[in-house]
């Protein structure tokens, strides 16, 4: 009997959040181990479909780094990286677009639909969804001066066509976006998926930006989870090197989205089943909540 009461209490705990977020938009960056483990893929799909059934508009932006690496290796193309950014020449961009748009995007859409969703796959070229420009990478030269170098078809989002996303949402569809942007001349750009998610969330004035990662969330120097943090506190933790490495661009992406109007950002562990529901509909959550 107790386990039944516990289930009822869990449902009651979720009730105020369901009421608060119905009709709002969540932008979720889907990536990491959650995209490769079959059990986690099913869990994520069910979480997203649950959000939609509760009246929450979920917009998915997915990554695909491992799949890109595997395909480039198969084609014998060696990648060069500058400060973590893939140098993307024309040949590499063709492979990136093929993998993200033609393979990964369709896999995510198919999985959501298989589990009862109405997902529609998009990339930045569809309806000029992600109008983009070339991103120049800053590096420090031998003389200590900051230089900007061209790393090919790597871009940043200039404008998001929210009309297309809103039209799909109103029809009950789940937009699934591949992080490939389009330039003014129709050229394709490879864009960091976290950045795309942040820009889309800001353009939609989203309630939440949620990044699925392969860590529990933002950790302190003792490797303990920080459950709640403000942007100001986050910058201090970067300065004292509590936050380092690959987590820095993720928290910076969240900070930019918050400054541009997103209400809250969350960095959560995508390796945990139903991580999205546990973060949103429980009082404690399972990851890090970032506020302005």
From Swiss-Prot:
Site feature location: Transition state stabilizer: 29, 250
Pathway, per Swiss-Prot/TrEMBL? Amino-acid biosynthesis; L-arginine biosynthesis; N(2)-acetyl-L-ornithine from L-glutamate: step 2/4
Q: Does the keyword Zinc apply?
A: no
Q: Would the keyword ATP-binding turn up in this protein's UniProt record?
A: yes
Gene Ontology biological-process annotations: arginine biosynthetic process via ornithine; L-arginine biosynthetic process
- Subcellular localization: Cytoplasm
Catalytic activity reads: N-acetyl-L-glutamate + ATP = N-acetyl-L-glutamyl 5-phosphate + ADP
The protein's UniProt keywords, in alphabetical order, are: Amino-acid biosynthesis, Arginine biosynthesis, ATP-binding, Cytoplasm, Kinase, Nucleotide-binding, Transferase
Any idea which GO molecular function terms this record carries? acetylglutamate kinase activity; ATP binding
Which annotated residues bind substrate?
64-65, 86, 190
EC number(s) for this protein? Answer: 2.7.2.8
Cellular component GO terms, alphabetical:
cytoplasm
Classification via InterPro entries? AceGlu_kinase-like_sf (IPR036393), AcgluKinase_fam (IPR004662), ArgB (IPR037528), Asp/Glu/Uridylate_kinase (IPR001048), Glu/AcGlu_kinase (IPR001057), NAGK-C (IPR041727)
List the Gene3D superfamilies: Acetylglutamate kinase-like (3.40.1160.10)
Chief site of localization: cytoplasm
The enzyme's first-digit EC class, named in words, is transferase
* PANTHER family tied to this protein: N-ACETYLGLUTAMATE SYNTHASE, N-ACETYLGLUTAMATE SYNTHASE, MITOCHONDRIAL
User: What does this gene product do?
Assistant: Catalyzes the ATP-dependent phosphorylation of N-acetyl-L-glutamate.
Alphabetized NCBIfam families for the sequence: argB
The Swiss-Prot or TrEMBL record describes its family as follows: Belongs to the acetylglutamate kinase family. ArgB subfamily.
Q: What's the protein called, per UniProt?
A: Acetylglutamate kinase
User: Whose protein is this, by species?
Assistant: Trichlorobacter lovleyi (strain ATCC BAA-1151 / DSM 17278 / SZ) (Geobacter lovleyi)
Name the gene behind this protein. argB
